[in-house]
């Protein structure tokens, strides 16, 4: 059985600027004199984990319950700012349609919170029927986040599919490494805030890449 994995949420939709704005609004409401500009936010999001991002920025001066309150505020504003503000990235709908036509399984392999994924699903509901996805993962599904391969090994086992018949689309080098370490063919589909310091081969023509992969492997 063949499988297409969309990785981090940035493979489906550009939300980095909306999330940065949501973080800054949350900081202000919580009473913190913090402001994440585009430059430092780009560096922060090269690895996943919003709660960890807050902890590291505070230099562990905030208590866990305070970090959670800030993150909950961020989620609230992310939901608010996402309404009618996002659409799928170019090529995504073609890939999903190709999977449906050819009976290829679909996975959305994230290590983020269910609250965040629910916002993405709601925001893209005009374009994407997430019932077409055979598996959607969250942070609870692995003990170690990307670039550790745990979440992809979990997905492969859960769907009972072969790695050599699977392909992953990821948006940052860190998340790309997670899929590669699981020995899955991986395409780097950089987002607007993605930093590719190691010059990993990347592509914005993901439909062509996916189609070529399965044609070579004779679906």
Residue locations for each model-derived region?
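Alpha-helix N-cap/helix-start capping motif
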Residues: 16-17, 48, 93, 111-114, ...
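Short, Lys/Arg-enriched, disordered terminal segments
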Residues: 1-2, 101, 214-219
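Substrate-recognition element of Asp-dependent hydrolases with the DxDx(T/V) motif
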Residues: 23, 92-123, 179
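N-terminal helical cap/lid subdomain that shapes the substrate entry/recognition surface
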Residues: 2-93, 98-102
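Conserved SAM-binding loop
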Residues: 12, 106-109, 168-169
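A general structural motif
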Residues: 1, 103, 163-165
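Asp-based, Mg2+/Mn2+-dependent phosphohydrolase catalytic module
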Residues: 113-114, 119-219
């Amino acid at each position: 059985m063949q499988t297409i994995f969309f990785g981090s949420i940035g493979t489906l939709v550009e939300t980095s600027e909306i999330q940065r704005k949501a973080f800054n609004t949350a900081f202000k409401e919580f009473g913190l004199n913090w402001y994440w500009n585009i430059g430092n936010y780009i560096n922060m999001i090269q690895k996943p984990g919003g709660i960890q991002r807050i902890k590291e920025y505070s230099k562990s001066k905030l208590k866990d319950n305070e970090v959670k309150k800030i993150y909950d505020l961020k989620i609230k504003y992310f939901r608010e700012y996402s309404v009618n503000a996002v659409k799928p990235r170019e090529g995504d709908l073609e890939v999903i349609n190709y999977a449906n036509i050819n009976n290829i399984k679909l996975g959305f392999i994230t290590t983020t919170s269910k609250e965040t994924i629910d916002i993405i699903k709601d925001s893209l509901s005009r374009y994407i029927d997430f019932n077409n996805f055979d598996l959607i993962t969250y942070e609870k599904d692995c003990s170690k986040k990307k670039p550790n391969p745990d979440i992809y090994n979990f997905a492969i086992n859960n769907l009972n599919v072969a790695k050599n018949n699977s392909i992953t689309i990821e948006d940052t080098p860190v998340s790309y490494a997670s899929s590669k370490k699981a020995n899955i063919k991986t395409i780097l589909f950089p987002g607007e805030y993605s930093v590719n310091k190691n010059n990993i081969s990347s592509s914005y023509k993901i439909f062509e890449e996916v189609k070529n992969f399965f044609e070579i492997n004779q679906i």
